[in-house]
């Protein structure tokens, strides 16, 4: 979980010495330019989708590689992207205006309200539209012992949209970055090295790539974090409906070292 913002990636790279980029380096993408995304979660998938969509509109051909070692179609920890899995109403509306409607196989339950529990009492906050437009979902393909659940991964769905636009997913870990003739070069765990015209960092705070950037000319500092515990409990559809209903419960209690707790009903 990110706690405090640091110097942005854009600020960091804009302050890089010109000799690192190379004299006369053209920063405009051209036909055949190569773009790499470090991280294939929602940030990387959305960036890729809209980049290729805009490139298509101006008849610009790009080669885009998404580096993501995880397979979001897998159950359990190997497919989990370390998130409780909740999409806000505002994001659902923004996606809809772009023609992106999350299918029922991805949205497991529509959330109608938030219930906030504090030491002084509890209060329910209803959705302004009074509709179930807050989405509960799985970032991966669900719990390891989840059984035969017919749900699709949110991250895999978005990644699939990017692939349909022409991106290529490389399930490899990037272990090194340097500059060759003013362009970033990425080295993978198997030793493969590739040079790109643009590298976009869409990795999470747990990514080792963020630490690699600290020693690069960009000098990006990893953000401060706090520990987050994510787990799943099999309650059953009837049990969830009886105990929680279609509400996400948030606990803001005076317990040492606890920022908050938030059970999310799914299924």
Model-found features: residue ranges?
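Glycine-rich FAD pyrophosphate-binding loop
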Residues: 52-81
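Short beta-strand to alpha-helix junction loop
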Residues: 83-89, 131-160, 208
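Beta1/beta-strand and adjacent pyrophosphate-binding region of the FAD-binding site
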Residues: 24-43, 65-67
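Charged, glycine/proline-rich intrinsically disordered loops and linkers
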Residues: 84, 99, 123-145, 218-219, ...
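Predominantly flavin-linked oxidoreductase catalytic cores and closely associated redox partners
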Residues: 50-53, 152, 157-267
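N-terminal FAD cofactor-binding segment of flavoenzymes
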Residues: 71-123
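Conserved Rossmann-like nucleotide-cofactor binding loop
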Residues: 43, 72, 206
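Glycine/serine-rich phosphate-binding loop and adjoining beta1-alpha1 elements at the start
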Residues: 1-19
């Amino acid at each position: 979980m990110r706690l405090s913002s640091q110097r942005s990636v854009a600020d960091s790279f804009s302050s890089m010495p010109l000799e690192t980029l190379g004299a006369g380096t053209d920063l405009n993408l051209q036909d055949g330019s190569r773009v790499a995304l470090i991280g294939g979660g929602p940030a990387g998938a959305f960036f890729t989708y809209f980049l290729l969509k805009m490139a298509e509109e101006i008849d610009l051909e790009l080669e885009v590689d998404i580096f993501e070692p995880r397979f979001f179609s897998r159950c359990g920890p190997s497919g989990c992207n370390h998130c409780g899995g909740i999409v806000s109403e505002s994001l659902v509306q923004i996606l809809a205006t772009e023609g992106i409607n999350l299918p029922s196989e991805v949205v497991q339950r529509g959330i109608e309200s938030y219930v906030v529990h504090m030491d002084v009492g509890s209060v329910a906050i209803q959705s302004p539209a009074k509709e179930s437009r807050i989405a509960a979902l799985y970032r991966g393909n669900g719990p390891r012992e989840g059984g035969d659940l017919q749900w699709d991964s949110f991250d895999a769905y978005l990644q699939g949209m990017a692939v349909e636009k022409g991106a290529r997913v490389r399930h490899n870990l990037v272990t090194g970055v340097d500059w060759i003739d003013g362009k970033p070069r990425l080295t993978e765990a198997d030793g493969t090295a590739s040079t790109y015209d643009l590298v976009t960092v869409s990795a999470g705070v747990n990514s080792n790539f963020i630490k690699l950037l600290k020693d690069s000319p960009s000098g990006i500092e990893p953000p401060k974090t706090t520990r987050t515990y994510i787990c799943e409990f099999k309650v059953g559809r009837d049990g969830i409906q009886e105990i929680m209903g279609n509400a996400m419960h948030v606990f803001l209690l005076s317990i040492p070292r606890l920022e908050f707790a938030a059970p999310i009903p799914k299924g």
